[in-house]
Amino acid sequence: MSAKIKVDEISSIIKERIENFELNINIEETGKVVNVADGVASVYGLKNVMANEMVEFENGVKGLALNLEENSVGVVILGSISGIVEGTSVKRLGKLLRVPVGDALIGRVVNALGEPIDAKGPIEYSETRFVEEKAKGIMARKSVHEPLQTGLKAIDALVPIGRGQRELIIGDRQTGKTTVAVDTIINQKGQDVICIYVAIGQKQSTVAQVVKKLEEYGAMDYTIVVSAGASEPAALQYLAPYAGCTMGEYFRDNSRHALIIYDDLSKHAVAYREMSLILRRPPGREAYPGDVFYLHSRLLERASKLSDELGAGSLTALPIIETQAGDVSAYIPTNVISITDGQIFLESGLFNSGIRPAINVGLSVSRVGGSAQIKAIKKVSGTLRLDLAQYRELQAFAQFASDLDESSRKQLDRGQRMVEILKQPPYSPLPVENQIVIIFAGSRGFLDDIPVSAIGKFENELYSFIEAKYPNIFEDIRTKKTIEKDLEENLAKALNDFKMTFSVK
């Protein structure tokens, strides 16, 4: 007996199969390399590619579409150009460049793409973010009101920095710009601030030295180092600051505080100029392309102090600019000065005369940091800037005048001691309470009878003396953050007691 065919059952199975059928066709738009030179490839055939879209070469190297022309696309190569020749096929990836973010990066040295370069194994990250993010709007921000202590007396007293500020460090080569930045990172220990140090166009040996110093002082426990060395393609040097900024924004957006240092944006502008000229973009002043201002403004505007509704996190930026022979009126320095909230100007003349950090107090300014400065340091350093300016004027006058009146001589002597107080050896940031004590001693005349050569010894021994005999002074300054009459009297008593025991020899 022949089996009866169940027509209804078969037709329902066929219908179900048709309904569940998925046609997986992966359509890829590809093009060919027309020519390649200096890390930039000209690609024909990618008709629908978008600006800043990622592309991939047949050998797996990624690229970034920067120039969209009528018949070709200018692609900067994010890696080695070996193996990329005329005729190499390129495919669109349909996405923008992203980098890993999060706590997994802390303590690591990565390149501009967030890949580890410190031989400590892969990074187990759980989140990535776009390298190019839009800066927060006005309503998402809050005015800068919390201090970010650098540990340097000259900065914390005269050019204070607040969390969420952009403060430029500017000066000639070999004037201690990186040292100021590294000191600031070291001083964030225990302050719950994540630091990101972005090295752009630096020698690998220089970056290794910085990392070694940070490890030596235990600062790598809260620091990420992003390095795009001098030997790396201009495209990676161009991307490094944006990648570092994205990593910092992750902490800011999660109600935490971050500090980012761009060392330095002069080399960043040079890398962008190199890329732009190879892409045949029209050059402008000093051969930089027309959008070089936007290059830095869109980066530095991302630093901010967020409103309470968004978690009150902050990202503070300390960009570094290298000048030529102290010329701050060049194109890139003036651009960055106009973008930032103030600048710390380092002078080679001061550096060579032994005043280190070599900060020119007259030219350095902080436009918003004053509202973030704690009351105690504001009180003791209130007239310090004016006193130093008058001292410099008198000093210039004293070179020509042989006899000075008593008040001028006193002013000169006091000024000399204040300059000596503001000197600080590298990699030894001071807690703010120690800074307040020594500036109080100098500005109130307690050091007038101490020889200038003995000021350093006096300062070091004073901290130990107060710690041992008057520990409540440091504690009161730390907790109250202001100097009231009783604390002022107690501090004056401590200074007088110490002077009785202090020996110059």
UniProtKB/Swiss-Prot annotation:
Family annotation (SUPFAM superfamilies): C-terminal domain of alpha and beta subunits of F1 ATP synthase, N-terminal domain of alpha and beta subunits of F1 ATP synthase, P-loop containing nucleoside triphosphate hydrolases
Key words, A-Z: ATP synthesis, ATP-binding, Cell inner membrane, Cell membrane, CF(1), Hydrogen ion transport, Ion transport, Membrane, Nucleotide-binding, Translocase, Transport
Principal location: membrane
Signal peptide: none
InterPro entries in alphabetical order: ATP_synth_asu-like_sf (IPR023366), ATP_synth_asu_C (IPR000793), ATP_synth_asu_C_sf (IPR038376), ATP_synth_F1_a_nt-bd_dom (IPR033732), ATP_synth_F1_asu (IPR005294), ATPase_a/bsu_AS (IPR020003), ATPase_F1/V1/A1_a/bsu_N (IPR004100), ATPase_F1/V1/A1_a/bsu_N_sf (IPR036121)
UniProt catalytic activity: ATP + H2O + 4 H(+)(in) = ADP + phosphate + 5 H(+)(out)
GO terms under cellular component: plasma membrane; proton-transporting ATP synthase complex
Task performed by this protein: Produces ATP from ADP in the presence of a proton gradient across the membrane. The alpha chain is a regulatory subunit.
Protein name (Swiss-Prot/TrEMBL): ATP synthase subunit alpha
Lineage: Bacteria, Pseudomonadati, Campylobacterota, Epsilonproteobacteria, Campylobacterales
